[in-house]
Design a protein with these regions (language model features):
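Sequence signature of WD/YWTD-type beta-propeller architectures
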Residues: 2-330
Length: 330
């Protein structure tokens, strides 16, 4: 540490002591803030806050103000009860919930936390990157999540993802599905720029849909876990969400190359190949949730909205200051 000139030896000693105290105090404050942030980020569900006991159609969201999972309840103050675990992304189905939780510090690291219906921790997996997408199959047996490895937005050209699949029946974890054999345009595709994200599962816990990006284009892929294979079905489909009857896919479609609202929410009929936009006119960047066979829920502008899947009607706000919608249904 350089010592100022023009001061007496005694004054110079006091200046050094004061500087050390200030540095030490700053380090202590940083440590306390980091510890406090870690405790908040790692907060578990309150006793009695579970997915059981709620009506099957009850909506759960991530409450932005607290960072915790909340049950939407019009009779509660603020319209919700935020007593769940702290998560950056949350999804639940069957007897399982999945909480993606970012850890404080640099470089970015996170946890994938598997929970039961009482929101008690079953398994915790440390991950590099930033939480992006989370999905649980309808049975609760198979889970998938996507992390940003570099970058923090799908709108950027310089992003990379890692998508994992966990089978709770066997405990087997695929840390990154990028090595799955991919058929694109009728041929086996090999490229170093392959990225997958936005996995959604069919009812058989084997077939899945996802987005693959390669060569500057995005494609909808249909995957087979048992045969460990994937094939591209069509271009310009991101974050697919399969309808409860397995006949349609809600997805975000790029409609603009600009950074402002580049995606719109669409629905694809798998049998006919026809697609149509829903009545949401604003751009979205989310993996939509089917709340029933006719309705979609999704995050937009810091709130959770719903809209009919057939293109009729108009968007309706479900929860302000919220994201990551999911249902309590088994």
């Amino acid at each position: 540490m350089p010592v100022p000139t023009g001061f007496s030896p005694r004054a110079r000693v006091w200046i050094i002591v004061l500087a050390l105290l200030l540095l030490g105090g700053g380090a202590t404050a940083y440590t306390l803030r980091a510890a406090s942030g870690h405790r908040a980020a790692d907060r578990a569900a309150d006793p009695g806050f579970t997915l059981d006991g709620a009506d099957p159609g009850t909506l759960y969201v991530r409450d932005t103000a607290t960072g915790r999972v909340a049950r939407v309840d019009p009779s509660a103050p603020g319209g919700r009860v935020a007593g769940g675990p702290a998560c950056d992304r949350f999804h639940a189905a069957g007897n399982t919930a999945l909480c993606l939780q970012r850890r404080p510090g640099v470089p970015a690291r996170s946890y994938a936390i598997v929970l039961d219906r009482r929101l008690r921790e079953v398994r915790r997996i440390g991950l590099p990157g930033i939480p992006s997408r989370a999905r649980v199959s309808a049975s609760g047996n198979v889970l998938a999540w996507t992390m940003f490895a570099t970058g923090d937005s799908y709108a950027r050209s310089s992003f990379s993802t890692r998508t994992s699949v966990l089978d709770l029946r066997t405990g087997y974890l695929v840390k990154n599905i990028e090595q799955i054999p991919l058929t694109l345009g009728g041929r086996r595709h090999h490229a170093p720029d392959v990225n997958y994200w936005g996995v959604g599962f069919a009812a058989d816990d084997n077939r899945f849909y996802a987005t693959v990006s390669t060569g500057g284009r995005t494609h909808l892929v249909e995957g087979d876990l048992a045969n460990w294979s994937a094939r591209a079905l069509r271009e310009n489909v991101e974050c697919p969400s399969l309808s409860p009857d397995g006949t349609r896919i809600a997805f975000k479609k790029r409609v603009s190359e600009g950074p402002r609202e580049p995606w719109r929410l669409y629905v694809l009929d798998l049998a006919t190949g026809r697609e149509h936009p829903v009545a949401e006119r604003h751009g979205i960047d989310d993996q939509a949730l089917w709340t029933d066979a006719r309705t979609l829920a999704y995050g937009r502008g810091g709130d959770v909205w719903s809209v009919p899947a057939d293109g009729s009607g108009s968007p309706r706000a479900l929860a302000r200051g919220a994201s990551s919608p999911t249902l309590a249904a088994r």
